[in-house]
């Protein structure tokens, strides 16, 4: 039955089309050979009718005249640039059809700029917009061939994806054919060849070819421009699109995060380091933009800056929740939170009174205790003081409140020894306040931990404790710490004059007459193991340190008068 219903049609043969073709050709000949159908050079009223009756392949070309090609404006090139730069500009604009060219001379950037020639290999950067991904791919291929034949080397091209598939890739895809597509196969709207970079290898020129949408999103110009031209490339936050596509949001958020801190985070950090302020309304706008970006990698850093600018917008509790929900190691989160506690205005002392500053230190430690309890809850882990090199110093500094912006520390001494610093920054008044009870508790905690684990405090930590007592004006503790911590009576570790050099440099910067008199009367005496006895048995690490020691002692002698000043000066002159 099925064979009667379903009959195979006869095979279509050319002989069925032959009569149709002959009739069409005959009609065409009649239309062309008739005198009334011959086109009049002066114009004929029936021309349109005749043209419509003719087959398409015999009609006159009715295309509209070509519009004048827009001239691409080439950017200005400095006279100091090589001649090859102009040739590449003309090649990209005129031969390859790119427009909106922007040229950056990286050699003219300041040495401290992040993208100056001191920090990266590019001397000149050209940015151009292509018409499509296919246009960019074709132009990049031609550019590679041009450089190969003109300059006799192959350039490095990144971001270009050709249509060809290597045999190795085909075999790999064949093996994966039964496993489904890889997650990386999804481009989330970032089409291949939307951004191609060519390192020409000619006079340090780098060429970036992008589609218009990709170029607007990346905003590469803001990275390489001068600071005074940054306003030219500022972009307004993109408005949310009303789309039913399932990746309408993912497409935008997929690569926006890393670029957010590059464009927004740096200005915020600079503002944080300056004395200027920013209105709360603008900060709320930045928070809204950041939430839309979906960036999770720099979330804590962003909100940390906002908190330091205005703690009313982001509280310490909110920062703690961000750290707890993040994926960073617990010990790293604790250190980051401790740094925030050091600078937070939310728990800062309202006035520089002993009671207010002690209460501020108590609040710091309470916040830290609660955070450590929350982040280590149900984990079965315990915080180790040696788990991070910054943990012990930060724990000590949490019990100290700075009274002045400039405080003498180990780094200050290093700068004074190796460079010249302005001593006017430091006065003879205490620059820090120590919460004595909490400070003693923390010191006992650190000492007990070291004793239980057979650890020895590092030299940097001992020096930090020493300078803290000196900065607070607690000279009794300062000298007792110096004798014990630096093992003055039986010093087998330090066989040079380095510790004495650092001590006299600190006393010179601290400029306290009481401390200077104690040093000259007690630690410059032959009746006690002192700097004088060490001068006879030990050497300086360099002649520069020796000269600095002499000039520093002379500076100290000018600040106070002691009966032994003449003897000390004689000893210094003999060095």
Swiss-Prot record:
Its main location: mitochondrion. GO terms for biological process: mitochondrial gene expression; mRNA stabilization. It is a peripheral membrane protein. The keyword Mitochondrion applies. It holds the Pfam family RsfS. Keywords: Membrane, Mitochondrion, Mitochondrion inner membrane, Transit peptide. It is found in: Mitochondrion inner membrane. Signal peptide: none annotated. InterPro entries: Atp25, NT_sf. Belongs to the ATP25 family. Probable mitochondrial mRNA stabilization factor. This is ATPase synthesis protein 25, mitochondrial. It comes from Meyerozyma guilliermondii (strain ATCC 6260 / CBS 566 / DSM 6381 / JCM 1539 / NBRC 10279 / NRRL Y-324) (Yeast). The gene is ATP25.
